[in-house]
Amino acid sequence: MATLATIDLRSDTVTRPTAAMRAAMAEAPVGDDQYGEDPTSNLLQARCAELLGKEGALWLPSGTMANQVALRVLTRPGDEVIVSRECHAGWHETGGSAANAGVQLIEVGDRGVFTAAEFEAAIKTRAMPVYAPSTLVEIENTHNRSGGIVFPQDEVVRICALARKRGLASFLDGARLWNASVASGRSEADLAAPFDLVAVSFSKGLGAPGGSVLAGSKELIVAATRHRRMLGGAMRQVGILAAAAIFGLDHHRERLAEDHAHARLLAETLAGSPAVRLDLSSVQTNIVVFHLAAGAPDAGALVARARERGVLLNAFGVRTVRAVTHLDVTREQTERAATVLRELLD
């Protein structure tokens, strides 16, 4: 008897390049990117600068490196960075913010979001020499560990205006900014406008095998180029990967709404179980983070049992589980995954 294909909801990073994306990669004209001679990389950088409303952009091999380069460009060792609670830079980059940039992160807010008032309260006074100077505010949009929540743009504008007034730089970790744009109906340029530097990723919802871009002023991009080299991220014929990113921008950006609908379907099914605690208002894009009630299996047990039934998930804590919809998961597969999880929980 034929077995059903595995449904991988661990992350949107598990997507595989489509046949058409692979063809675009194979046909991409390339050159030495460190000499500025890779035409496909140059095209991607120019396009992203325009999409994000910035003067320039720089390709990097990963979102983590983009974040780390941004920290090095916008801070000095010993500085303090104000971030959202459970941000990627603090929870998923193996201490890189301390090791690479020499900064400490101060988490504020709740569920991936904070207010301008909370931000201002976290800024250390420079009159006290015992404090690390607050020099940067970082916002993650959408916010991974908070279930793909979209940071309210009105609050973003207030926070970044206050940062400028108080002499702090601003950075947007927009690894999933494409999702935020689709969910909010705002352009990427609008979402990125208040920030000094912006990072976006191509290896998640857009389905490319790797790559991110930093965008900002020409001066900041020159500095980022130096730090990219310092961290080992400067590559040669990167047009092969840049072509995948361009293909994703052309063909996979608008369809992100399908992923969002699939996540909503999954969340609504799970929310009907007494074993699940899930605030449906938090399910705004393609990530579903749910909590297991007392008496239900713990996260590790549920993940193991789901795997036996062909559904892959991630445990995000003792009683917290994450599921992520993406390019490689159909509506039918989402429905099957939801059915499997309800059977395991009820």
Say what each PLM segment does.
Residues 2-309, 313-329, 333-345:
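Conserved PLP-enzyme active-site core in the AAT-like
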